[in-house]
């Protein structure tokens, strides 16, 4: 008797499955369409044998280009390692590698644009075309405006840390390629306040992503909705059918081991093609300020990303000095 397909196999028929990791071996094993890299993952890569040659090469570059401006050298090595890891990952996946712009640029439109262009140029030097890369940017007003310009230049963007409808709609209106609403972090906020949902259908993160997905489809938006930051397979299963789902290796493994039925939960609705009303900076700020959860989680998310980047830079500094 033929075994029934795993839930991971069934999910792949409903949504594009993305690996929320830069773990080379996990990506080889789990075969996602897309994957990601960020400072935390690059820092972990410093200890993985598969990246040893890349790391030694870039550290040697850093030692040779030390000069007087040590911080600039450290930052450049961090960029080179990020793109180097991304280049290796691009050879494993048929789709895209998301590459994160420095979180400390989250409120600087022009600096975000400059860093994105730099990453794309660095990838090109390594033989990776821009259609293999998504530039990951925090969904502040300034980040969304940077993405608007980058999209016009043909550089596709992944706007991350989406917690609020105005963030999502502003991204769609700006023509952003993809948004990443954070399911688990939304749930975390309410659970911390003693508001644990009675069922998965009442999970505030699941409800939010379903709402954004339905509105985008109804309005005919081409912006891809990629659910992110999952705390359980139940959250993932509740969003089966979403455009894309980015999932950690441990949850991918659990889905792969489960051979139960996985029904579709999200489907494109009949579009009424009602245009998304442009959102200006004032209404965006007002909406965000009125949403305690989004305000807290966007700020803490940026802060966490910035601390991760600083930890990577410190590790590089230590290795350059060693």
UniProtKB/Swiss-Prot annotation:
Catalytic activities: D-sedoheptulose 7-phosphate + D-glyceraldehyde 3-phosphate = D-erythrose 4-phosphate + beta-D-fructose 6-phosphate
Domain of life, source organism: Bacteria
EC number: 2.2.1.2
InterPro entries, per the entry: Aldolase_TIM, TAL/FSA, Transaldolase_1, Transaldolase_AS
Active site per the UniProt annotation: 136 (schiff-base intermediate with substrate)
Localization, UniProt: Cytoplasm
Functional pathway: Carbohydrate degradation; pentose phosphate pathway; D-glyceraldehyde 3-phosphate and beta-D-fructose 6-phosphate from D-ribose 5-phosphate and D-xylulose 5-phosphate (non-oxidative stage): step 2/3
GO cellular component terms, semicolon-separated: cytosol
GO MF: transaldolase activity
Pfam family, one: TAL_FSA
Keywords attached to this entry: Cytoplasm, Pentose shunt, Schiff base, Transferase
BP-aspect Gene Ontology terms: carbohydrate metabolic process; pentose-phosphate shunt, non-oxidative branch
Quaternary structure note: Homodimer.
Function: Transaldolase is important for the balance of metabolites in the pentose-phosphate pathway.
UniProt record similarity statement: Belongs to the transaldolase family. Type 1 subfamily.
Full protein name: Transaldolase
Upper taxonomic lineage: Bacteria, Pseudomonadati, Pseudomonadota, Gammaproteobacteria, Lysobacterales
């Amino acid at each position: 008797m033929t075994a029934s397909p795993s839930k991971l196999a069934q999910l792949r028929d409903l949504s594009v499955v993305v690996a929320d990791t830069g773990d080379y071996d996990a990506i080889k094993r789990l075969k996602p369409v897309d994957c990601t890299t960020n400072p935390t993952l690059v820092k972990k890569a410093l200890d993985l044998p598969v990246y040893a040659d890349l790391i030694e090469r870039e550290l040697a570059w850093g030692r040779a280009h030390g000069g007087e401006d040590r911080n600039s050298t450290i930052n450049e090595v961090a960029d080179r390692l990020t793109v180097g890891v991304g280049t290796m990952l691009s050879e494993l996946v048929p789709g895209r590698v998301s590459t994160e712009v420095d979180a400390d640029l989250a409120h600087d439109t022009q600096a975000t644009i400059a860093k994105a262009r730099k990453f794309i140029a660095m990838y090109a030097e390594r033989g990776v075309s821009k259609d293999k890369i998504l530039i990951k940017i925090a969904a502040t007003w300034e980040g969304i405006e940077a993405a608007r310009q980058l999209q016009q230049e043909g550089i596709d963007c992944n706007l991350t840390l989406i917690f609020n409808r105005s963030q999502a709609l502003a991204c769609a209106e700006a023509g952003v390629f993809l948004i990443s609403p954070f399911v688990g972090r939304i749930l975390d906020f309410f659970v911390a306040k003693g508001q644990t949902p009675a069922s998965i259908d009442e999970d505030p993160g699941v409800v939010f992503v379903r709402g954004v997905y339905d509105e985008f489809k109804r309005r005919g938006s081409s912006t891809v909705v990629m659910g992110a930051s999952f705390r359980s397979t139940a959250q993932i299963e509740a969003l089966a059918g979403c455009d894309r789902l980015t999932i950690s290796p441990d949850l991918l493994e659990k889905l792969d081991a489960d051979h139960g039925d996985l029904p579709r939960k999200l489907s494109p609705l009949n579009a009424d093609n009602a245009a998304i009303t442009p959102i200006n900076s004032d209404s965006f700020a007002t909406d965000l300020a009125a949403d305690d959860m989004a305000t807290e989680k966007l700020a803490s998310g940026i802060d966490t990303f910035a601390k991760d980047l600083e930890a990577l830079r410190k590790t590089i500094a230590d290795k350059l000095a060693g």
